[in-house]
Regions:
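N-terminal pre-catalytic "stem/leader" segment of glycosyltransferase-like enzymes
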Residues: 1-84, 397
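C-terminal amphipathic helix plus adjacent low-complexity
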Residues: 1-3, 12, 19, 23, ...
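A nucleotide-sugar donor-handling region in carbohydrate enzymes
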Residues: 2-9, 121-132, 137-232, 264, ...
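Donor nucleotide-activated moiety binding/catalytic core segment of transferases
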Residues: 75-92, 259, 264-308
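Extended catalytic core of nucleotide-activated donor transferases of GT-like folds
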Residues: 40, 69-135
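Conserved catalytic-core segment of nucleotide-activated headgroup transferases in glycan assembly
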Residues: 36-44, 182-183, 190-273, 345-347, ...
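A donor-sugar binding/catalytic signature common to diverse glycosyltransferases
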Residues: 93-117, 121, 287-330
């Protein structure tokens, strides 16, 4: 039995003595490892605008804890006695990535689970795939009966709730509702209220103070943010133009910098990052994705839904489709080529040509208002307020 499971035994015992308290909300993200995504932005919104609510971020990393303490943001280390008491009293458990964002948040009377999804539906999500498909994708062996029982026990001790316990999830437009529904059972509500993390894209003063790449002020910034391969079990995305000194020289001469940011799920497969004067790998810099896209003049991706967030900035988008993700990986719910939100390329030469075209005629390649409104019902930076209202007055947001 590992450490978390042992602590889980203690947490289960402690929970007997604490009832849920109204207006006590806890937040977590990224399996307890980082402070970002929707939980970050909704928590800070709550602290500023609704101080009558008792809110606290739960983390499993001491670096995150120290960072938040310095910022004056309520935070506790997940495995401490103080955090276990905080969690035991929480009315709302709010998370962004997995149920493992916060340990020991067991089901109990009066408790609510709110999942701030970390992306809009495009590629097929785990919840829409069979366990057998996921096992094959990841190259895993079939679990034995004994292992399955151990996993169930671990879930009971450390997590204590399931996907069906989620009260609702949100989408950014009505177009996306039917695809989000493919990922959740009918008892999970779907509300078109936006994403809390996108409010930051409307907050220029805030973004000036967020951590960002040093030494690139005044550069024309192109950020490449591909999605994961096989949910972290696939081959890492190669850095474009790593073996093209001609392209690197052109970028340098024209004041262009290409930032390479692999998907967080692939982080364990990123061993040797490649950086040059005009190409910088930022994968391991622990940068907030919203900060990355805010400071980018052009976003390059493939099947990550980050481009939907980026539409709010009304800047050019390039889809660099370099492999057979659609047929040999998880695939997608719909074909974005049928109503393209940006430009498409399939090899480095075409990618380079698009960079030159956009640099020379930037405004020509901005997304249309029609495309923006297809993926965003609201373009106002008020998603956190809508989320607050959806949680506190749910009948008004069915």
């Amino acid at each position: 039995m590992n450490r978390n499971n042992i602590i889980g035994l203690f947490a289960r015992f402690i929970n007997v003595f604490y009832r849920v308290k109204k207006q006590h909300w806890i937040f977590g993200a990224d399996n307890g490892l980082t402070y970002r995504e929707g939980s970050k932005y909704l928590l800070e919104y709550m602290v500023t605008n609704h101080p009558e609510y008792h809110c606290c971020f739960i983390t499993q990393r001491h670096e995150v804890y120290e960072e938040l303490v310095k910022k004056g943001i309520p935070c506790k280390m997940n495995n401490t006695y103080g955090a276990i008491k905080e969690i035991a009293r929480a009315e709302c458990v709010i998370f962004t990535h997995t149920r493992g964002d916060i340990h020991y948040a067991y089901k109990k009377q009066g408790r609510r689970y709110i999942y701030l999804v970390h992306g809009m539906p495009l590629k097929r999500a785990k919840k829409a795939l069979s366990k057998e498909t996921m096992r094959i994708l990841k190259g895993q062996k079939k679990a034995s009966w004994l292992k399955k029982q151990r996993m169930k026990l671990a879930n009971w001790l450390t997590t204590g709730h399931n996907a069906k316990d989620i009260e609702f999830v949100s989408v950014t437009s009505d177009f996306l509702v039917k695809y989000m529904r493919l990922q959740y059972s009918e008892n999970v509500g779907i509300k078109t209220i936006g994403m809390p993390r996108n409010d930051a894209l409307f907050q220029s003063e805030r973004m000036k103070n967020e951590k960002w790449v040093k030494g690139i002020d005044g550069k024309f910034v192109i950020t490449y943010m591909p999605t994961h391969r096989k949910y972290g079990a696939g081959v890492i995305t190669p850095t474009p133009f790593a073996n093209r000194p001609d392209v690197q020289n052109w970028l340098e001469d024209n004041g262009v910098v290409l930032l390479m940011k692999n998907h967080p799920t692939m982080l364990n497969r990123v061993h040797n990052t490649q950086s040059y004067s005009s190409i910088i790998d930022i994968t391991k810099m622990s940068l907030d994705p919203q900060v990355c896209i805010y400071h980018s003049d052009v976003l390059v991706t493939d099947f990550s839904s980050v481009w939907m967030d980026y539409l709010l900035l009304r800047r050019p988008i390039v889809f660099y489709i370099y492999d057979d993700f659609e047929t040999e990986d998880v695939g997608t719910y719909y074909d974005i080529r049928e109503d393209p939100p940006g430009l498409f390329c399939y090899n480095e030469d075409d990618f380079f040509q698009l960079i030159k075209q956009i640099k020379n005629d930037y405004d020509k390649f901005r997304p249309s208002d029609r495309i923006i409104h297809k993926y965003h019902k609201f373009i106002d930076g008020n998603s956190c307020e809508r989320y607050f209202q959806a949680i506190t007055t749910p009948d008004n947001y069915t």
